[in-house]
């Protein structure tokens, strides 16, 4: 406990920090109502990814008062749906001071500890399939979403444990941080900074196509939400909410082209070994 207190105090600073939370764009599995996996993006997910890149370039990377560039950080998980969502974000170099120190904007950092809750034997299933094949597990999860652990998988409590060192690292930053992540993981980060009870965190609203801006203050946390993409008629047939009510065939995707393009992407050189 003493060590954790010392670590916390060493990360405290007086500067107001801003954290931006974004779910990945709609994935192929979102469209099919499946959980887990490592699928690519649907066409709607790709549209959001492009819009996120524009938002970072035009808004997030600039000081709101002066319009001058401000240094920003970028985190993703190691799963391709977050990496593909962030790949349109530019990485220009900016000058930090008169001494010529440079900063690479949104230098991508890929973190396995940011990966979505692992669903174990239920990975790749819809909730209807889980209820049909594992009715007891389905009931247990409904009774205790926070503590329930998927067979051979994880629980929300497990994810809290692996997020702990990253939360402390976030506390130490003074630059804005954009986290492109997953619903379950972002729920817990959101709950931490807003002071939400962790039991309620399991159902916190982290919608697709939206950036949530959090500014932690002394006794509260300011929050704003900006919807970057509204589904259009061309998205008909796509499950815009990313839930498990989708039907029909697989949404058209851009995954193959994106995978080919990603070999020259800086993300490919910035992975970390698993720690759970």
Which residues are covered by each model-predicted region?
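Short glycine/proline- and acidic residue-enriched helix-loop micro-motifs
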Residues: 137-155, 241
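Residue-level preference for the first positions of well-ordered beta-strands
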Residues: 19, 174-180
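Eukaryotic N-terminal low-complexity, Ser/Thr- and Lys/Arg-rich leader segments
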Residues: 1-17, 64-66, 98-101, 218-276
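Short, conserved phosphate/pyrophosphate- and ester-handling motifs at nucleotide-, phospho-/glycolipid
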Residues: 24, 45, 182
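Short glycine-enriched, charge-decorated loop/helix-capping segments at active-site entrances
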Residues: 34-41, 126-127
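GST superfamily/GST-like fold recognition
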Residues: 183-187
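Short beta-strand scaffold positions
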Residues: 76-77, 161, 179-181
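Phosphate-coordination/substrate-recognition cap region in phosphate-metabolizing enzymes
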Residues: 3-8, 14, 26-29, 50-139, ...
């Amino acid at each position: 406990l003493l060590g954790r207190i010392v670590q916390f105090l060493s990360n405290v600073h007086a500067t107001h920090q801003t954290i931006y939370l974004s779910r990945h764009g709609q994935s192929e599995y979102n469209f099919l109502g499946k959980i887990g996996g490592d699928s690519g993006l649907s066409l709607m997910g790709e549209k959001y990814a492009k819009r996120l890149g524009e938002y970072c370039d035009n808004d997030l990377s600039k000081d709101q008062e002066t319009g001058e560039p401000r240094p920003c950080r970028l985190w993703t998980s190691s799963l391709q749906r977050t990496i593909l969502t962030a790949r349109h974000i530019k990485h220009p170099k900016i000058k930090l001071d008169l001494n010529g120190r440079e900063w690479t904007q949104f230098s991508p950092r890929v973190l396995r500890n940011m990966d979505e809750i692992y669903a174990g034997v239920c990975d790749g299933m819809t909730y209807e399939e889980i209820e049909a094949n594992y009715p007891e597990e389905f009931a247990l999860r409904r009774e205790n979403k926070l503590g329930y652990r998927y067979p051979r998988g994880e629980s929300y409590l497990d994810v809290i444990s692996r997020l702990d060192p990253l939360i402390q690292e976030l506390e130490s930053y003074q630059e804005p941080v954009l986290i492109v992540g997953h619903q379950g993981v972002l729920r817990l980060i959101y709950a931490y900074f807003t002071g939400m009870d962790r039991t309620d965190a399991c159902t916190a609203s982290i919608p697709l196509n939206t950036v949530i801006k959090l500014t932690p203050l002394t006794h509260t946390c300011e929050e704003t939400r900006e919807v970057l993409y509204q589904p259009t008629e061309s998205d008909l047939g796509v499950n815009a909410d990313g839930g498990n009510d989708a039907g029909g065939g697989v949404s058209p995707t851009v995954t193959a082209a994106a995978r080919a393009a990603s070999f020259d992407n800086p993300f490919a050189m910035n992975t970390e070994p698993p720690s759970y």
